[in-house]
UniProtKB/Swiss-Prot annotation:
Keywords noted in UniProt: Ribonucleoprotein, Ribosomal protein, RNA-binding, rRNA-binding
Annotated NCBIfam families: PRK00099.1-1
Pfam family, one: Ribosomal_L10
Family membership noted in the UniProt record: Belongs to the universal ribosomal protein uL10 family.
PANTHER family, sorted: 39S RIBOSOMAL PROTEIN L10, MITOCHONDRIAL
InterPro entries from the UniProt entry: Ribosomal_uL10, Ribosomal_uL10-like_sf, Ribosomal_uL10_bac, Ribosomal_uL10_bac_type, Ribosomal_uL10_CS_bac
Assembly and oligomerization: Part of the ribosomal stalk of the 50S ribosomal subunit. The N-terminus interacts with L11 and the large rRNA to form the base of the stalk. The C-terminus forms an elongated spine to which L12 dimers bind in a sequential fashion forming a multimeric L10(L12)X complex.
The name this protein goes by in its record: Large ribosomal subunit protein uL10
Biological role stated in the UniProt entry: Forms part of the ribosomal stalk, playing a central role in the interaction of the ribosome with GTP-bound translation factors.
Protein's GO biological process: translation
GO molecular function: large ribosomal subunit rRNA binding; structural constituent of ribosome
Organism from which the protein derives: Beijerinckia indica subsp. indica (strain ATCC 9039 / DSM 1715 / NCIMB 8712)
GO cellular component terms given for this protein: large ribosomal subunit
Length: 172
């Protein structure tokens, strides 16, 4: 990699670190190519990205970004996973780490907050933004549905009473 490519890589990483909401750092030593491809595929499916870059270039790109607290974690064969959804990258990383012993989560950052391994794991247990939106819509719709049922209930009772009188008159 020549100097121009390194500058381009640092600029791209710095842009990612400025815009992303969560970054997870992990060791990947000992994983096969197929396992790495599987990890990338799972991350893409959840809206996250995995990138392997030189630690030195990542450290340079981290300077002045909100997630600069992950800099000490960059030792050895590390990868970074990031996503705009604060839960997507940690959720996939934790799930992948459960299945693969050689994939070790080191920590991460969410905004300016540094996360240790337990922080990443607890973040992974939270519902995603879409799940939270679904729950909120359900909570908002439930009272409206009950209100509609209450307003139509007296009319339905009246209709049943009139139907019963009509059936009684027909029978007589």
């Amino acid at each position: 990699m020549d100097r121009a490519e390194k500058k381009e890589s640092v600029a791209a990483l710095a842009d990612v670190f400025q815009k992303t909401s969560v970054v997870v750092v992990a060791h990947y030593s000992g994983l096969t190519v197929a396992q790495m491809q599987n990890l990338r595929k799972q991350m893409r499916a959840s809206g996250a990205t995995v990138q392997v870059a030189k630690n030195r270039l990542v450290k340079i790109a981290l300077d002045g970004t909100p997630v600069s607290s992950i800099s000490p974690l960059l030792k050895g064969p590390t990868l970074i996973a990031y996503s705009d959804d604060p839960v997507a990258a940690p959720k996939v990383a934790v799930g992948f780490a459960k299945d693969h012993d050689k994939f070790v989560i080191l920590g991460g950052a969410m905004g300016t907050t540094a996360l240790n391994v337990d922080g990443v794991r607890s973040l992974a247990t939270m519902p995603s933004l879409d799940e939270l939106r679904g729950k909120l819509v359900g909570l908002i719709q439930a009272p409206a549905t009950k209100l509609a049922q209450l307003t139509t209930a007296p009319a339905a009772k009246l209709a049943r009473v009139f139907g019963a009188y009509a059936a009684k008159d027909d029978a007589a």
